[in-house]
Structures are given as C-alpha cells and as structure tokens.
C-alpha cells in the first residue's frame, strides 16, 4: 500500500460512520415495510378491550334497568296491598249491610212502637255506610242508569214504557266497588223495548 492509499485514523472513522449511515438508510426502508407483530397484537388487544368495555356498559345498564323495574313493581305491589287490604273484610261486611237494608224495607213504619227501633237501625246503617265509604267502598246500582255488564248482573229483562231500553229499572241487590275494583255486581232488572 502506498501512502496515498493508507488513510489516517480520522479518515477511517469518517468512512466507518458513512458506511454505518448507508447501512441504516438501507435497513430503514425494510423495517418500515415490515409491520411489527407486537403492534398488531396491541391493536387486537385494544379492540378486545373496547368490546369488553362496551359489553360491561350494556350489562350495567341492563342491571340498572332491571333493578328499577323490580323497585317499581314492589312499590306497585305495596300500593295495591294497602289499597285492597280491606277487600276480604269488606266482602264480609256486604251481607251485614244487605240485612240492615232488608230490615228497614220490611219494618212496619206505621207501628209507632217500632219507630225508635227503626230510627236506630237507620242510624246504624248510615254509620256503617259512612265507615266503609272512608275505606273506598262505593255503592253500585242506581235505577235509570244504562246497563253496564262490568258492574251490573242482569237477572231479568222486562218491557217498560217508563225506562229507556237497556237501562236499569230495578235493583234487586246493590253492588259494591273497592277503590274501583268490583267487589260484587249489582243484581238488576233491565228494561227492554215494548213489543
């Protein structure tokens, strides 16, 4: 080797740096084209995580909605229990009311010696009706109203010139409702058009 061909140590270092830069430049396009398998795995895991988070949000919303529904149903059941707690008792009181009304209907009002007793039965019936009314019990069975199969039970149909067709013309037994729920239908005679 000649002195011209021999390089100084500084030149050798510079040549090595340039060669390294060239190799890096050649290697860089290769790494850019080849995807790192770790990046693919990270993207896959992020997608799974996002899907699981969405499922958990949906489940949480469903559970919350179900809890609200259970709470609402429980409140409605409690309200119904309070509202209709006296239903059995009220049903047992209806024959007592009927008997007091029958006693008044059959009493001899012309007999002066029975006047005090009749007045006492009337006051007792009035007190009883006031008491049951406070608990939501209402009487069904007025004469002259249109026949309603939801609250009336037709016992007979009679021709009548005094009443419109399909109207209650006589009440045989009063009916009762408890807070809008039918306890007992009114037994009635219904008018029909004369032939």
Curated annotation (Swiss-Prot):
Family matches, as Gene3D superfamilies: 3.90.20.20, Head domain of nucleotide exchange factor GrpE
UniProt KW Chaperone keyword: yes
UniProt biased composition (Basic and acidic residues): 1-20
One GO BP annotation of this record: protein folding
Assigned keywords, A-Z: Chaperone, Cytoplasm, Stress response
Cross-referenced SUPFAM superfamilies: Coiled-coil domain of nucleotide exchange factor GrpE (SSF58014), Head domain of nucleotide exchange factor GrpE (SSF51064)
PROSITE patterns: GRPE
Region named Disordered: 1-40
Entry GO terms, CC: cytosol
Localization in the cell: Cytoplasm
Superkingdom in the source lineage: Bacteria
Self-association state and partner proteins as the record states: Homodimer.
Entry's family note: Belongs to the GrpE family.
Protein name as annotated: Protein GrpE
Species this chain originates from: Pectobacterium atrosepticum (strain SCRI 1043 / ATCC BAA-672) (Erwinia carotovora subsp. atroseptica)
């Amino acid at each position: 080797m000649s002195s011209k061909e021999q390089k100084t140590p500084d030149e050798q270092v510079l040549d090595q740096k340039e060669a390294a830069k060239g190799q890096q430049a050649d290697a860089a396009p290769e790494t850019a084209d080849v995807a790192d398998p770790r990046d693919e795995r990270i993207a896959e895991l992020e997608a799974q995580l996002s899907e699981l988070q969405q499922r958990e949000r949906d489940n949480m919303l469903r559970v919350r909605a179900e809890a609200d529904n259970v709470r609402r149903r429980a409140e409605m059941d409690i309200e119904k229990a309070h509202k209709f707690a006296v239903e059995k008792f009220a049903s047992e009181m209806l024959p007592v009311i009927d008997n007091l009304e029958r006693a008044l209907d059959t009493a001899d009002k012309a007999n002066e010696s029975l006047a005090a007793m009749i007045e006492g039965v009337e006051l007792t019936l009035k007190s009883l009706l006031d008491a049951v009314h406070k608990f939501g019990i209402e009487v069904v069975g007025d004469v002259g109203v249109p026949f309603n199969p939801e609250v009336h039970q037709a016992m007979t149909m009679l021709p009548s010139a005094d009443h419109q067709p399909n109207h209650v013309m006589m009440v045989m037994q009063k009916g009762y409702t408890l807070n809008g729920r039918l306890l007992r239908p009114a037994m009635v005679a219904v008018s029909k058009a004369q032939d």
